[in-house]
C-alpha cells in the first residue's frame, strides 16, 4: 500500500476515533464548509468466534451531520444486526458466521434529506491471517471466492456477497478502485482474475475492469443512476494454464443516487375550476411533478409543492392552499365572485429533497364557474299591450330580464310564471336564445265580456338561488280590441226527425243564430253550406229549412238513417263574419219498397233437380219488412212451386213436373208485413243433367268465352308466322351457281416469281402445295352444261412420302387429269395471273411438261362455249403452236 492509503486509513487513528466517539457522543458545533456523511465508506469488525450471541457489540460507525442535532435513525441492510443512535453496531439475534465474511450496509439521512451509506464487514479472524485482518480494517473491501463443495455436502446458505456501492457523478480520479477479488487458490498457484457482464463486456461496455493479477476491480468513469441503478457482473479466477479454479462469483454494483435532477411538472399549464360561493376546504384541482432521482432510498426524488403567487390577489391574497405532498389545491378563503374575478392564476413550485432541494415552477389556472347568486331582474317592469279578441296563440308581449350570471347556464336561464291567471286566458314561455319571456293568449279574449286584463309575472332561474335573493315582478296591462265576430248558431248542432215522404216546401226546422257583437246592430243571413243530395232549401232571412220532396232514406247519401247538412250564417259587418252550424236529419222510413228475390237467374237439371233457394231482401227497415209471403202468378204456378223457409227470409223454388231443356220465366209475387206487394220475374235455365246443376254443358260446348277465342286466334297467328319464317330459311339455303371461269379482267395475285427470266424452261421446280390442293379440291359434282360421257372416275395417285418419287407422282396424276373429261375447266393445276402483252414469260410450258409421249387433241373445247375458251387456248392450238 502507498503512503497515502496508510495516512487515510491508519488503524491507530480509527481506534482513537472510536474511543473519542464513546467519550464525546455529540459535538454541538456547526463547522462551516462541513461535508455530511459517514467518516468511512467501509467498516470492518473482526471477531474471534464463529457464533455471535445476541447483544454482542461489534463496533461503532461515525456519522458527520454538520449540525448540532443528535442523529438517531439508521437503516441496517441485514436484519440480524441493529445500530444504536450513537452509531454502535450490535448483534440483534444469534448469528453463525461461515467461511465467508458477513457483509451488509448501514444507511442514514442528514438534515437536508440526503442519504448516506457505508459498508460493514464482519470477519471471523479464524479464517484470516493476522496480516489480512489488519489490512482489511483500513483498506478497501476484499471479496473472496466461496469455497467449492463436492459430493453431497450441503452449501452454507448464509454466504452473502454485499453489493458494492458507488456514488453517481464522482469526480475521480479515474480509474478508481472499488473492491479486490481474491481466491484462496493463490496459495497453490498463480491466479488470474477477470470480470464479465453488464458494464464490463456487455453494454455499456468498459465501465468496469479488473487488474488481472491483483484482482482489483476499478470503475473507469462517473456513473449515472438515472441510466443504470445497478450493474450485475461475474468475477472469474483461472490458473496459469487457463483452467478455472473458482466458480464464477456474482458481484452487484449499486449506484448511490445524488440530487442531480430537478423536478419536472407533467403539464405546462394545469387547469381546474371551482364554483363561486363554495365553502372553504373545497378541493379545486391537483398538480403533479416528477423527479428522475431516487425517492425510495433518499429524499432526492421526494417532491414538496408550494404556491408562490396568486393572481389576482383579490379579495384576499391567499385564497388557495396546496398539499405539499400530493399537490392538491384547495380553497381556504371566501369571497369567490365570478362576476368580478372569473379566473385565478397560481404560480406553484415543486422542490425535491422534500422541499429543500432543486425547484421547478408551473402554472395552475383556476376558472370560477357560475353559481346562481344573481337574480334575474325585469327591465322594464311595466308593459301595455293591445290584443284583438278571439285570437288564440297571439303574442301579447315579450318581457326582458337582466341576469349577471353566465349566459347559457341554468343559473342564467329565466323561468317565467303568471302570478294570477284567472280563466287560463294567457300562457308564458321562455325564448332559449334571448332569455325573454313570451306572453301569448291561451284562449280567445271576448271584448264583450272583458275589455282589459292586468297580469303580474314573476321570474326565477332554472336552478334555485345559491343565496337568498328577491324575486323580480313585472306588470302587463292587456287591452282587448273589439273586432267583428262571426254569428253563432244556437245550438251549433241541430237534430231533427223527418219522414222520407216529406212533401215539397214542407218545413223541417227553423235555425237560430246570434251575433256576439251585441253593441252593434247587424243583419244575419242564412245559407246552405253543403247539401250533398240537394234535398233542402233555407230562407235567407229567417233560417227556415224546407224540403224539396226528394228525401229517400234508402239513398247512398243517408248513413245510418241520418243525413248531414252544413249551414252558414253571415252578418253585414266589416269584415263579414261567417258562422257555421250542422243540421242532422234523422230520416224516418216509410214502406216504399217491396221485397225482391235474389238471385233472379239460375240453372236447374231436368232430372231430379234440387230446389233453388232465393233470398228475400227489402230496402225498408222493420216493421216494413218480414215476415214475407210468396205466391206465383201468370201461369208459373202450373209448373213451379214456391215455399218460404221457417224464418220467412228466404224461399225455395222447384218444378212441379219434369221440364224439358230450355229457358223459363217465373213470376214471383212477394209481400212484406205491411202487405206491400212486389212482382219479380225470375229466369230459370233447365239443362240435361241430374241433381244439382251449376252450368249447362251445352252452353260450354256451343259457345266460348272471349279469352278462349283470343288464345285460339293467337295460336293460329303464331303458326302462320313460323311457316313464313321456314319458307324464307329454305329459300336462302339454295345453292347459287358460280361462274366456272373468271372474267377476262379478273386477275389473281398467284404469280410465281422465277429467279431467271427468259432462261428457258425450269419444269423441275414444282409447287407441291398447289399440285396437291388442285387435285384434292375438285368439287364432287357432275357437269351440268353438257351431257357428260359416262366413264369411270380416274384414279389419282396419292402424294408419295419420298421426295425422290415426286416426278413420277406429277407425271401420273397429270396424265390422269388429262384423261378426265369430267374435270371442269377451272380445275387446272396452276392458275397464272395475266401479266400483260409482251411479257418475257409469255410462254409457260407447265402443261407440256408431262413425260407422257401421247399427244392429246383439245380442240373440242372450242365447241363447249365461251366459258371454255381460255382452257381451249391453254390446251388446244394449231400445228404452228406444236412446232414451236
UniProtKB/Swiss-Prot annotation:
It is found in: Cell membrane. GO terms for biological process: adherens junction organization; calcium-dependent cell-cell adhesion via plasma membrane cell adhesion molecules; cell migration; cell morphogenesis; cell-cell adhesion mediated by cadherin; cell-cell junction assembly; homophilic cell adhesion via plasma membrane adhesion molecules. Residues 731-884 are cytoplasmic. CDD domains: Cadherin_repeat (cd11304). Residues 27-157 form a propeptide. Residues 158-706 are extracellular. Glycans are attached at residues 427, 560, 683. Keywords: Calcium, Cell adhesion, Cell membrane, Cleavage on pair of basic residues, Glycoprotein, Membrane, Metal-binding, Repeat, Signal, Transmembrane, Transmembrane helix. Three calcium ions are usually bound at the interface of each cadherin domain and rigidify the connections, imparting a strong curvature to the full-length ectodomain. Cadherins are calcium-dependent cell adhesion proteins. They preferentially interact with themselves in a homophilic manner in connecting cells; cadherins may thus contribute to the sorting of heterogeneous cell types. This is Blastomere cadherin.
Amino acid at each position: 500500500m502507498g503512503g497515502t492509503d496508510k495516512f487515510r486509513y491508519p488503524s491507530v487513528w480509527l481506534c482513537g476515533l472510536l474511543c473519542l466517539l464513546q467519550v464525546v457522543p455529540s459535538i454541538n458545533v456547526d463547522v462551516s464548509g462541513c461535508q455530511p456523511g459517514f467518516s468511512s465508506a467501509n467498516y470492518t469488525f473482526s471477531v474471534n468466534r464463529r457464533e455471535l450471541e445476541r447483544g454482542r457489540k461489534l463496533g461503532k460507525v461515525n456519522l458527520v451531520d454538520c449540525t448540532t442535532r443528535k442523529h438517531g435513525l439508521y437503516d441496517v441492510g441485514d436484519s440480524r444486526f441493529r445500530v444504536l443512535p450513537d452509531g454502535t453496531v450490535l448483534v440483534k439475534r444469534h448469528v453463525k458466521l461461515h467461511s465467508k465474511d458477513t457483509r451488509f450496509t448501514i444507511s442514514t439521512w442528514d438534515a437536508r434529506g440526503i442519504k448516506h451509506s457505508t459498508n460493514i464487514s464482519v470477519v471471523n479472524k479464524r479464517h484470516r491471517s493476522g496480516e489480512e485482518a489488519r489490512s482489511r480494517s483500513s483498506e478497501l473491501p476484499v471479496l473472496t471466492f466461496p469455497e467449492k463443495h463436492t459430493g453431497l455436502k450441503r452449501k452454507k446458505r448464509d454466504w452473502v456477497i454485499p453489493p458494492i456501492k458507488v456514488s453517481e457523478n464522482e469526480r475521480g480520479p479515474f480509474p478508481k478502485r472499488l473492491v479486490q477479488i481474491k481466491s484462496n487458490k493463490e496459495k497453490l498457484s498463480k491466479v488470474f482474475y477477470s470480470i464479465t457482464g453488464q458494464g464490463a463486456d456487455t453494454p455499456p461496455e468498459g465501465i468496469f475492469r479488473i487488474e488481472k493479477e491483483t484482482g482489483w476491480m476499478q470503475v473507469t468513469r462517473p456513473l449515472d443512476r438515472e441510466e443504470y441503478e445497478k450493474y450485475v457482473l461475474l468475477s472469474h479466477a483461472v490458473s496459469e494454464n487457463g483452467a478455472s479454479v473458482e466458480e464464477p462469483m456474482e458481484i452487484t454494483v449499486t449506484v448511490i443516487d445524488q440530487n442531480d435532477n430537478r423536478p419536472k411538472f407533467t403539464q405546462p399549464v394545469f387547469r381546474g375550476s371551482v364554483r363561486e360561493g363554495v365553502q372553504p376546504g373545497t378541493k379545486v384541482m391537483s398538480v403533479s411533478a416528477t423527479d428522475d432521482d431516487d425517492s425510495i432510498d433518499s429524499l432526492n426524488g421526494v417532491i414538496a409543492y408550494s404556491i408562490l403567487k396568486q393572481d389576482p390577489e383579490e379579495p384576499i391574497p391567499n385564497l388557495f392552499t396546496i398539499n405539499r405532498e400530493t399537490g392538491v389545491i384547495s380553497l381556504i378563503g371566501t369571497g369567490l365572485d365570478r362576476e368580478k374575478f372569473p379566473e385565478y392564476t397560481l404560480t406553484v413550485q415543486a422542490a425535491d429533497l422534500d422541499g429543500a432541494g432543486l425547484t421547478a415552477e408551473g402554472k395552475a389556472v383556476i376558472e370560477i364557474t357560475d353559481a346562481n347568486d344573481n337574480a334575474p331582474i325585469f327591465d322594464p317592469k311595466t308593459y301595455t299591450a293591445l290584443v284583438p279578441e278571439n285570437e288564440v296563440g297571439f303574442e301579447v308581449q315579450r318581457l326582458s330580464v337582466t341576469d349577471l350570471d353566465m349566459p347559457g347556464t341554468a343559473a342564467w336561464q329565466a323561468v317565467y310564471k303568471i302570478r294570477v291567471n284567472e280563466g287560463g286566458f294567457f300562457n308564458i314561455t321562455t325564448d332559449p336564445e334571448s332569455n325573454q319571456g313570451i306572453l301569448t293568449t291561451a284562449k280567445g279574449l271576448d271584448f264583450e265580456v272583458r275589455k282589459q286584463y292586468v297580469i303580474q309575472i314573476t321570474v326565477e332561474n332554472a336552478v334555485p338561488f345559491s343565496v337568498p335573493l328577491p324575486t323580480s315582478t313585472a306588470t302587463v296591462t292587456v287591452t282587448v280590441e273589439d273586432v267583428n265576430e262571426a254569428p253563432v248558431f244556437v245550438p251549433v248542432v241541430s237534430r231533427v226527425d223527418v219522414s222520407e215522404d216529406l212533401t215539397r216546401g214542407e218545413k223541417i226546422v227553423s235555425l237560430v243564430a246570434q251575433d256576439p257583437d251585441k253593441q252593434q246592430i247587424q243583419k244575419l243571413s242564412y245559407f246552405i253550406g253543403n247539401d250533398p243530395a240537394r234535398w233542402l232549401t233555407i230562407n235567407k232571412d229567417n233560417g227556415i229549412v224546407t224540403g224539396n220532396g226528394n228525401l229517400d232514406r234508402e239513398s247512398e247519401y243517408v248513413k245510418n238513417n241520418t243525413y248531414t247538412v252544413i249551414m252558414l250564417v253571415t252578418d253585414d259587418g266589416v269584415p263579414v263574419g261567417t258562422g257555421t252550424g250542422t243540421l242532422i236529419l234523422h230520416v224516418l222510413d216509410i214502406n216504399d219498397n217491396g221485397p225482391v228475390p235474389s238471385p233472379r237467374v239460375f240453372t236447374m237439371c231436368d232430372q231430379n233437380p234440387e230446389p233453388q233457394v232465393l233470398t228475400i231482401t227489402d230496402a225498408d227497415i222493420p216493421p216494413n219488412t218480414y215476415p214475407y209471403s210468396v205466391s206465383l202468378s201468370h201461369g208459373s204456378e202450373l209448373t213451379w212451386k214456391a215455399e218460404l223457409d221457417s224464418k220467412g227470409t228466404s224461399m225455395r223454388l222447384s218444378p212441379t213436373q219434369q221440364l224439358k231443356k230450355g229457358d223459363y220465366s217465373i213470376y214471383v209475387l212477394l209481400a212484406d208485413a205491411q202487405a206491400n206487394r212486389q212482382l219479380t220475374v225470375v229466369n230459370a235455365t233447365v239443362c240435361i243433367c241430374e241433381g244439382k246443376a251449376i252450368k249447362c254443358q251445352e252452353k260450354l260446348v256451343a259457345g266460348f268465352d272471349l279469352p278462349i277465342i283470343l288464345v285460339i286466334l293467337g295460336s293460329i297467328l303464331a303458326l302462320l308466322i313460323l311457316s313464313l319464317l321456314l319458307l324464307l330459311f329454305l329459300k336462302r339455303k339454295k345453292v347459287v351457281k358460280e361462274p366456272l371461269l373468271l372474267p377476262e379482267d379478273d386477275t389473281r395475285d398467284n404469280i410465281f416469281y422465277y429467279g431467271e427470266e427468259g432462261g428457258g424452261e425450269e419444269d423441275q421446280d414444282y409447287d407441291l402445295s398447289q399440285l396437291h390442293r388442285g387435285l384434292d379440291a375438285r368439287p364432287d359434282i357432275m357437269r351440268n352444261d353438257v351431257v357428260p360421257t359416262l366413264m369411270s372416275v380416274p384414279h389419282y395417285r396419292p402424294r408419295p412420302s419420298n421426295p425422290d418419287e415426286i416426278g413420277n407422282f406429277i407425271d401420273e396424276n397429270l396424265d390422269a387429269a388429262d384423261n378426265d373429261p369430267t374435270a371442269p375447266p377451272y380445275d387446272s393445276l396452276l392458275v397464272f395471273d395475266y401479266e400483260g402483252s409482251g411479257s418475257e414469260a409469255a410462254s409457260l410450258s407447265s402443261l407440256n411438261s408431262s413425260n407422257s409421249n401421247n399427244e392429246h387433241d383439245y380442240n373440242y373445247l372450242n365447241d363447249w362455249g365461251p366459258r371454255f375458251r381460255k382452257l381451249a387456248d391453254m390446251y388446244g392450238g394449231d400445228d404452228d403452236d406444236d412446232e414451236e
